[in-house]
Design a protein with these regions (language model features):
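Gly/Pro-rich turn-and-neighbor structural signature
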Residues: 158, 167-173, 179-191
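Active-site-proximal, well-structured secondary-structure segments within enzyme catalytic domains
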Residues: 145-158
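Conserved short loop/turn motifs at secondary-structure junctions
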Residues: 161-163
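ATP/Mg2+-dependent ligation/transfer catalytic cores
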Residues: 1-148, 166-173, 187
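A short alpha-helix capping/helix-coil boundary motif
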Residues: 110-113, 155-159
């Protein structure tokens, strides 16, 4: 996460390339560590008035050549194709899935999938997933739904997007929003 201020909400074309030290992110060695962030998608930041979230590709110092870690640059973009993603994940707190007892495991699966009630979904999980849904919608992400999954502490959200790169950008931005949101709850995410 990096923050840059503008006088007004920028367009994608107004966003500059942004250099960074690739050795800090293990994307370059110290003797030749320059890397560049190239903005490729912009979303309104629902957590900040007049804020923007910017998805970037990592480029070599020339700003044109994709960095070896830049898998997005390899995507053949089909702007007319529709893609749907189901992102499953666990909430983790204190080294174990949220809702798991300190010793052992919760009751066998069954009541958790699309479950309701404190004993099935806990006290904070639903609050987080619903707030995440609202954040995604406010950011313009085509978030299609949420549900509790088969294990305690396990959830899923669905993203449906048109265009190969646009759909991929939306799932990455939705993941980012979820991780940023869970910081305030002291909870980690394990995606699978």
């Amino acid at each position: 996460t990096q923050i840059k201020e503008f006088d007004a909400f920028p367009t994608l074309e107004q966003l500059p390339l942004w250099g960074f030290d690739g050795s800090s992110t293990q994307q370059a060695e110290g003797r030749s560590s320059d890397c560049v962030l190239k903005p490729v998608a912009i979303y309104p930041d629902p957590a900040r008035t007049n804020g923007a979230l910017v998805m970037c590709e990592v480029m070599m110092p020339d700003g044109v050549t994709p960095h070896a870690s830049n898998a997005r640059a390899t995507i053949l973009d089909d702007e007319d194709a529709w893609f749907g993603f189901e992102q499953e994940y666990f909430f983790y707190q204190n080294g174990r899935p949220l809702g798991f007892p300190e010793q052992g495991y919760p009751a066998p699966q069954g009541p958790y999938y699309t479950g309701v009630g404190y004993s099935n979904v806990g006290d904070v999980a639903r609050e987080i997933v619903e707030e995440h849904l609202d954040l995604c919608l406010a950011a313009g992400i085509n978030h299609e739904g949420i549900n509790a999954e088969v294990a305690k502490g396990q959830w899923e959200f669905q993203i449906f997007g048109k265009g190969s790169k646009k759909a991929a950008d939306q799932i990455w931005m939705a993941r980012y929003l979820l991780q940023r949101l869970t910081e305030k709850y002291g909870i980690d995410i394990e995606y699978h």
